[in-house]
Amino acid sequence: MANEEVILLDFWPSMFGMRLRIALAEKEIKYEYKEEDLRNKSPLLLQMNPIHKKIPVLIHNGKPICESIIAVEYIEEVWKDKAPNLLPSDPYDRAQARFWADYIDKKLYDFGRKLWTTKGEEQEAAKKDFIECLKVLEGALGDKPYFGGESFGFVDIALIGYYSWFYAYETFGNFSTEAECPKFVAWAKRCMQRESVAKSLPDQPKVLEFVKVLRQKFGLE
């Protein structure tokens, strides 16, 4: 597929954008990265995602693919001949991978956000929900090195971006992920050893500083 144009509209702390960075890196797809200012969204972003007006947006030969999980599947389908395979070949296993990616999107983001945007009883409830969610994911991981088994893949890509936010979650939620969910942290550290992940995720202290600025804007500091 020569002369392809691949552009990623993204914002550096976005765990959703990190999914596409990792997937593109795993497939060794060259692309142009365009950092968005979400307070002053570019005409290109508004043109390419007129419905949600959100990042990330993958633009392939002028055509936009929105929503990060959909875009990761698109990357797998378009470049299926490039190793590694991001989704399992077995239909049942693919369905299970999609189930867990959906679970992550429906549960983890909101619980994590509440850890740094709330206080008191609401924050304590969010912490309980967040840790319970991680324990459910630990159960799905089991004793496997990755969610799909021996190989890094779809569910790992869907989840690992959140890890860059964990220092912020722990700081404001006042808990230790390693103490509560050691198997999850071991999995995350295993993922971080992959070049595609290490280069796609920002440093946790940098994300913490970003969250502190947001908290000040929201009047939480």
Swiss-Prot record:
Superkingdom assignment: Eukaryota
Reported tissue expression: Root tip-specific expression.
In terms of Pfam families, this protein maps to: GST_C, GST_N
The Gene Ontology biological process annotation of the record reads: auxin-activated signaling pathway; glutathione metabolic process
Reaction equation(s) it catalyzes: RX + glutathione = an S-substituted glutathione + a halide anion + H(+)
UniProtKB keywords: Auxin signaling pathway, Transferase
Q: What induces it?
A: By auxin.
Leading EC class: transferase
Disulfide bonding pattern of the chain? none
Q: Name one GO molecular function term.
A: glutathione transferase activity
Q: Has the keyword Transferase been applied to this entry?
A: yes
The residues covered by the GST N-terminal domain are 4-83
UniProt cross-references to PROSITE patterns, sorted A to Z = GST_CTER, GST_NTER
Q: Which InterPro entries match?
A: Glutathione-S-Trfase_C-like (IPR010987), Glutathione-S-Trfase_C_sf (IPR036282), Glutathione_S-Trfase_N (IPR004045), GST_C (IPR004046), GST_C_Tau (IPR045074), Omega/Tau-like (IPR045073), Thioredoxin-like_sf (IPR036249)
One annotated Gene Ontology cellular component of this protein: cytoplasm
Q: Where does glutathione bind?
A: 14, 41, 55, 67-68
**SUPFAM superfamilies from the xrefs?**
GST C-terminal domain-like (SSF47616), Thioredoxin-like (SSF52833)
Q: What is its EC number?
A: 2.5.1.18
Q: Which residues form the GST C-terminal domain?
A: 90-214
Hey, which family's this protein in? Belongs to the GST superfamily. HSP26 family.
UniProt xrefs under PANTHER family:
GLUTATHIONE S-TRANSFERASE PARC-RELATED (PTHR11260:SF726), GLUTATHIONE S-TRANSFERASE, GST, SUPERFAMILY, GST DOMAIN CONTAINING (PTHR11260)
Q: What is this protein called?
A: Probable glutathione S-transferase
Q: Which organism is it from?
A: Nicotiana tabacum
